[in-house]
Design a protein with these regions (language model features):
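WD40-like beta-propeller blades
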Residues: 1-225
Length: 225
């Protein structure tokens, strides 16, 4: 065993052990630096889709419509689903914009959040289960509609920082009627840019409620409850 296999973290020593290569290792379509990639807890499913926020070189065989790929932890394909950018919530006619982020819930549902506030909830086979909206109708119809600036998916929902400085949250995402609510964070539309956001789930907080910690570029750390 070589000494350079080990890395020090304060007074703890650890090393990485190579177990196996994922099945997609030679697949040009699955280069991780081109994709948004999220992994479910405890060695669960891996979801990946082309990162629409990056400027990527595409070949003639590439489709403009992104494909959502769900794999097992060894890289074996579970499902592939072409994503229609214009998936709409009932009663709305606007597109949802680029995909900003996605994540797995505790119930292994994939939550996909778009920049204009549209949320898609899909199962492990990529089938659309439900759609939600983080932007209300009045804002959507205004000349400067609110947008999602940053977002985190947690075990039972999603939390988003909007361009207006509001923090919006959804809980009970697995239920037939998820709960939508706003959280007070003290951020305005002209606050310093966000540098980090962490979601503290109810089972881990003293209050027993969902809490969010926000850090801004000017060194402020704010809590939203």
């Amino acid at each position: 065993m070589l000494a350079d296999d080990w890395t020090s973290l304060r007074d703890v020593q650890y090393r990485k052990i190579h177990l196996y290569d994922l099945d997609w290792a030679e697949d040009e379509d699955r280069h991780l630096d081109r994709c948004l990639v999220v992994v479910a807890k405890y060695g669960g499913a891996v979801a990946m889709v082309r990162d629409e926020t990056k400027l990527l070189k595409m070949s003639a065989k590439d489709s403009i419509v992104p494909t959502l790929r769900v794999c097992n932890c060894a890289g074996g394909t579970i499902s592939e689903t072409r994503l229609d950018k214009a998936v709409q919530a009932p009663g709305t006619a606007s597109e949802r914009g680029r995909l900003l982020t996605m994540g797995w819930t505790d119930g292994e549902m994939l939550v996909m959040v778009r920049e204009r506030g549209g949320v898609e909830v899909r199962d492990i086979m990529g089938e659309l289960s439900k759609t939600l909206e983080l932007v209300d109708d009045s804002s959507r119809r205004s000349s400067e509609p609110d947008r999602v600036e940053a977002c985190e998916v947690w075990g039972d929902g999603v939390v988003a920082l909007m361009g207006s400085g509001k923090v919006k949250a959804v809980s009970g995402i697995h239920s037939s009627e998820p709960r939508h609510f706003s959280m007070a964070a003290g951020l305005g539309a002209h606050a310093a840019p966000l540098t980090a956001m962490a979601v503290l789930e109810p089972q881990f907080t003293a209050s027993g409620a969902l809490e969010v910690v926000l850090a801004t570029e000017d060194g402020n750390v704010l809590g939203a409850t």
